[in-house]
Amino acid sequence: MDIFLAVLPAIFWGSIVLFNVKLGGGPYSQTLGTTLGALIFSIGIYIFVHPTFTPLIFGVGVVSGLFWAVGQSNQLKSIDLIGVSKTMPISTGLQLVSTSLFGVIVFHEWSTKTSIILGVLALIFIIVGIVLASLQSKEEKEAEEGKGNFKKGIVILLISTVGYLVYVVVARLFNVDGWSALLPQAIGMVIGGVLLTFKHKPFNKYAIRNIIPGLIWAAGNMFLFISQPKVGVATSFSLSQMGIVISTLGGIIILGEKKTKRQLVGIIIGIILIIIAGVMLGLAKS
């Protein structure tokens, strides 16, 4: 039962972008709707949990949420350019690399020879996995010469990675508990969502529809907080990376993104390598 709880965040988070695309609207309406959904769910959690608030917790939570909006909005922009099945392995890999390196440099996480070996191997696996998952078909290469969508998508994902990195590490730097940060984060997410999208007139029916992915995201967060004390941070972190399977294969199977046989093989091997790397990083943290 505990492992099942720990897998739920991956299932929930892995399905978010599939819901975003299926529910329609551009990345701006999708971002705004998702943040609103997260706020609604977080208010409900606050009513039942009653976490402790201080000015520091509130401020850190809001800043964290603002940067989550940067990460999510740019991830959705990348999906709009290069698709879910290409965006998500690259995005997940970049997030793992950035958070791991930050953990090593700032928090000195890899303190033993074993953890250093595991960590370095994991980073190599991630890089190889990203390369394999981002293979282009002949048609895509020809289209790239004209539009340059893949290059644009990668640049946007680098910005997204910075957003997600700050979202994750700022709460840790100030030792803010996840339950306490949940509502302030959601408030920051909505503020960030509005600031990043209001010029593009995102307030429409698609923003309302995309409240659903926001509810799903917040539910995934809740199950992460519940599972961590039961299975440990390392295990819950490793299992949460499995969402890449749902989002990537969902992009191909559910959303109908076309791939060549070579690309499919590259994506599958790339996903496996990134998942293995996630497990190795979890072990290196423990």
From Swiss-Prot:
- NCBIfam families associated with the record: RhaT
Q: Which domain of life is it from?
A: Bacteria
Gene name, Swiss-Prot/TrEMBL = glcU
Any one Gene Ontology MF annotation carried by this entry is: carbohydrate transmembrane transporter activity
Function in brief: Involved in the uptake of glucose.
GO cellular component terms, semicolon-separated: plasma membrane
Q: Does the keyword Transmembrane helix apply?
A: yes
Q: Pfam families from the entry? A: Sugar_transport
What is this protein's name? Probable glucose uptake protein GlcU
Q: Where is this protein found?
A: Cell membrane
Per the UniProt entry, what are the Gene Ontology biological process annotations, in alphabetical order?
Answer: sporulation resulting in formation of a cellular spore
Which source organism does the UniProt entry give? Priestia megaterium
